[in-house]
Amino acid sequence: RQAFNRVCTELFAAPERMGVAALMMMDLDNLKHINDTYGHDWGDQYIRRTGQCLRDNTPAGTVCARLSGDEFLVLFHGYRSRDAVREKIDCLTNAMQQSVALLPSGNALHISLSGGIAWYPDDGQDWETLKKYADFAMYQVKHADKGRVEEFDIGVYNREAYAERTRREFRQLLSNAQVFYCFQPIFSARSGRVVAYEALMRSDLPTLRSPATIMKLAREQGALYEIERITFTKALETFDSLCRAGS
């Protein structure tokens, strides 16, 4: 892993050597099942078979490494176009799908990988950014339909990042009761007098300016009771303080 990082850092420092490049991060789909069912020796054999397939089906100069237990990284570099890289990636993934590892039962298990691809220089021009984006693309595959390789999509990334920030700020809102209340007077049509007030919940957290967003997250996360509790206590406290101030 350290050697892979060192080589990639050196390559990224020399754009003329990188050309059009793709960083592909891959995760073995069945490793945990093999380890749990047959033992780690057979899981190690599955890993070795994957490594052999990478070595035998990538062009000379391609940088390959095992990142962790079930994750592999491949850097295709020095190409003139994305299509040229895609041809090499297709050859590799097809070879992977045809490769098998023998199990103690005598059955042959096809290697299954989920992968994500980030492009240099379009998606990022440094090693850490490409690795982050390739990792994101890979986990999009793993959480949807395993056994595929997908390219990074900045639009999906931005939507997911915003959604995660919204969830994080909602947790912050619940923990700190980070809302305030405005009061809308309700008038009697007959007398024209104020007969009640409607408490309107607001938040100054950037992604939670809309009460509709807060309520949607509360329903999704089973936190409606918490919102009701916060509203009951804070709305009454705010109303009382406004009355005392003569508002």
Language-model-detected regions and their locations in the chain:
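Conserved long alpha-helical elements within nucleotide-processing catalytic cores of c-di-GMP signaling
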Residues: R1-A22, D29-P59, A65-G69, L73-V74, ...
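C-di-GMP signaling machinery
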Residues: Q2, P121, F136, Q140-C182, ...
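PAS-family sensory domains
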Residues: R6, S114-G116, Y139, C182, ...
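Short beta-strand edge/capping elements of PAS-family sensory modules
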Residues: V20, E128, G147, V195-E198, ...
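Catalytic-core segments of nucleotide cyclases and related cyclic-nucleotide turnover enzymes
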Residues: H40, R86, D90, S105, ...
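Catalytic core regions of nucleotide second-messenger enzymes
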Residues: A65-L67, M96-L113, K142, C243-S247
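Catalytic strand-loop-helix junctions within cyclic-nucleotide turnover domains
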Residues: L75-V85, L103-A108, L113-L130, G155-Y157, ...
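Helix C-cap/alpha-to-beta connector motif
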Residues: I230-S247
